[in-house]
Amino acid sequence: PYVRCPADIRMLAGQSVAVPSGLGPDILIAPGVLFDEPDELPDVMRGEEIQIAGALLQNPAWAARSCMLLPGTHSKWAQIEDGRIVRYASYLTGELFAVLSQHSILGRLMPAATEKPRETDEAAFELGLSVARDSRPGDLSHQIFGTRTLGLTGRLPAASLADYLSGLLI
């Protein structure tokens, strides 16, 4: 079962289930959080609520009012007010990145994931963030294609395209 928004750590703890581990202390399973407003798409989170609780415990000032980005396969943008998760939205950020970089024309310009690890190009990532921030509604598909043209024209080196795309999608 999910705890409905607005949700706080007490509600999550109260709905957690203890499962015997067989190795000592029980394992607590948190219930997850449901955002379900009548005029909006429903949304669920499982696990990220624990990350939010930990962040609020480490940074108590954030509990008053903050917006948290939880990057990942299904990134979350969560609005926090008075220590409660009041709303959030999930995005297929990581999954979309994987599809675009591994199964589309964009990936042909990027170094293979099997190559040695490289340094993150923070400037390319920040460029992707700023292009997305300054965009108009409906521009995302054009911006994604721009990843290809930035590589083709040499405005970004191939090794930086993944970082640009990541910034664009986040």
Annotate each language-model stretch with its function.
Residues 1, 72, 170:
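Short glycine-rich phosphate-binding loop at a beta-alpha junction
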Residues 1-55:
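Glycine-rich phosphate-binding loop and adjoining helix at the ATP-binding site
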Residues 8, 116-121, 136, 153, ...:
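Alpha-helix capping and helix-coil boundary motifs
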Residues 12-14, 48, 89, 93, ...:
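Generic structural signal for well-ordered, non-membrane alpha-helical segments
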Residues 18-25, 130-142:
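An acidic intrinsically disordered interaction segment
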Residues 31-132:
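Glycine-rich phosphate-binding loop plus the immediately following alpha-helix
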Residues 133-169:
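Adenine-nucleotide phosphate-binding core of ATP-dependent small-molecule kinases
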